[in-house]
Swiss-Prot record:
Residue ranges of the TM segments: none
One of the protein's GO biological processes: translation
Gene it is expressed from: rps28e
Gene Ontology, cellular component aspect: cytosolic small ribosomal subunit
InterPro entries the UniProt entry points to: NA-bd_OB-fold, Ribosomal_eS28, Ribosomal_eS28_CS
Alphabetized UniProt keyword annotations: Ribonucleoprotein, Ribosomal protein
Pfam families given in the database record: Ribosomal_S28e
Organism: Methanococcus maripaludis (strain C7 / ATCC BAA-1331)
PROSITE patterns, per the entry: RIBOSOMAL_S28E
Upper taxonomic lineage: Archaea, Methanobacteriati, Methanobacteriota, Methanomada group, Methanococci
Keyword Cytoplasm attributed: no
The protein's name in its UniProt record: Small ribosomal subunit protein eS28
Gene3D superfamilies: Nucleic acid-binding proteins
Length: 76
């Protein structure tokens, strides 16, 4: 049943830059992605992505309104 799930509201985006890693163990990547469809076509967003990701990957976004906060500098 889970295989039949289709996100009709999802929009494709292409990863154009990887800004860094975040999360307690570094499992979240912060990426800049270019929206490829919908009303925000061509817009570039900063998003947090869980899991392995590389330049040129396509990700599906359920919404394109929110943008991730920029990563802060690491404290020593």
């Amino acid at each position: 049943m889970a295989d039949d799930m289709v996100y009709q509201e999802a929009v494709a985006a292409e990863v154009i830059q990887i800004n860094g890693r975040t999360g307690v163990t570094g499992e979240i990547f912060q990426v800049r992605c270019k929206i490829l469809g919908g009303k925000d076509t061509g817009r570039i967003l900063t998003r947090n992505v869980k899991g392995p990701v590389k330049l040129g990957d396509f990700i599906m976004l359920r919404e394109t309104e929110r943008e991730a906060k920029q990563l802060g500098k690491r404290r020593k």
